[in-house]
Amino acid sequence: MKADLVVGIQWGDEGKGKIVDSMASAYDVVVRYQGGHNAGHTIVVDGKKIALHLIPSGILYADCKNVIGNGVVVNPEALLKEMKQFEALEGRLFVSDKAHMILPYHEMLDQAREKLMEERAIGTTGKGIGPAYSDKISRNGIRMGELRDIPKLVEKIMEYQEAHAYLSDIYGVKLLGREEITERMSDYAKRLLPFIVDTTKLLWDAMDRGQRILLEGAQGSMLDIDHGTYPFVTSSTTTASGACSGTGLAPKHIGEVVGIAKAYCTRVGNGPFPTEDFGSEGNLLREKGKEFGTTTGRPRRCGWFDAIAVRHACRLNGCENLALMKLDVLDGFPEVKVCVAYLYEGKEIDYIPYDCEGVTPVYKSFAGWDHSEGIREFDALPKSAKEYVLEIEKITGARVSIISTGPDRKDTIRR
């Protein structure tokens, strides 16, 4: 039995939560494998909105095990707050003992750096994700399993803070005292240790028993640390390859990869965004799509569907199937557009160059349509909406097998 994977193939906020939620009932285990509480899913069930930042979307199903893998960076405070939304989590939620911990000074450092960088700021959420991953890579990180030995953990944090006292001088970061560290870590241990396990072994055992596993990515492929619009990227591997290192599953155990994309494009924070619309159409997309960050509330930058970027991401991830989200948001536009090429240094190209900032989109226009909201059969879509979907398939080389026509679970077309 192989594990299936859901991955965002734009700049994040594609609607992965709804798709994972709709798929999760067919799986025994749902796993989050990278990122932190900077990412956010909003799921609508029977009209009720549920926001998830760390806990996998399978938590809404009583018989599903939910795993926060070793590739995730965990803010204990954020996790505990999120856990309060649910009851009886023991035996349903598991946190990797190898997942790294976000501490208060990571958040303070993240926010201070962004402020000092001004125009060169990445536009991070300020949640401490980057500094926590930096500590992990420099081998100075704190892992969740270290909550098993509080005295040793407190000494380690104190030593780290002493070695990095310059952070207080340069960035104004407030370092914690021994008493506060001990109190916080003891509280985290008391409340979280029942959930902290070797999740790699848990997943291996589940696979040996023939259980179905669904891997849930956070953010999007165009924010990948290696393949995204560097340096305006996140600090983890958001592409399918991150699912292996972030869980302990081997590449041969990865099955179907489903790419998630909106029917238009959005981006939060700074960085290249070739199809961004600065005028009334971009504003209307934002208004109709309610494009404001789940985590920060910041307005998202909006623009037309970039088929070149999506095809690039499909190839990075090995996506043969796409889920196209929020098609209904395009209802009522007199004309809709798809970017089918870029102009770069006087030439038309069909790939993403090194300097993505320097491209101009080449669009193909389609007549608009009036009503797709709530439609659940492909043949029932307006003619121009079907043509739009088929053009996306043609350029990206991936089949659009799922189309979302509204926020509820039921507002979904499967082909």
Swiss-Prot record:
HAMAP family: Adenylosucc_synth. IMP binds at residues 13-16, 38-41, 125, 139, 219, 234, 298. Its cofactor is Mg(2+). This is Adenylosuccinate synthetase. The active site is at residues 13, 41. Binds 1 Mg(2+) ion per subunit. It catalyses: IMP + L-aspartate + GTP = N(6)-(1,2-dicarboxyethyl)-AMP + GDP + phosphate + 2 H(+). Coiled coil: none annotated. Homodimer. It is found in: Cytoplasm. Its EC number is 6.3.4.4. Keywords: Cytoplasm, GTP-binding, Ligase, Magnesium, Metal-binding, Nucleotide-binding, Purine biosynthesis. NCBIfam families: PRK01117.1 (NF002223), purA (TIGR00184). It comes from Wolinella succinogenes (strain ATCC 29543 / DSM 1740 / CCUG 13145 / JCM 31913 / LMG 7466 / NCTC 11488 / FDC 602W). Belongs to the adenylosuccinate synthetase family. Pathway: Purine metabolism; AMP biosynthesis via de novo pathway; AMP from IMP: step 1/2.
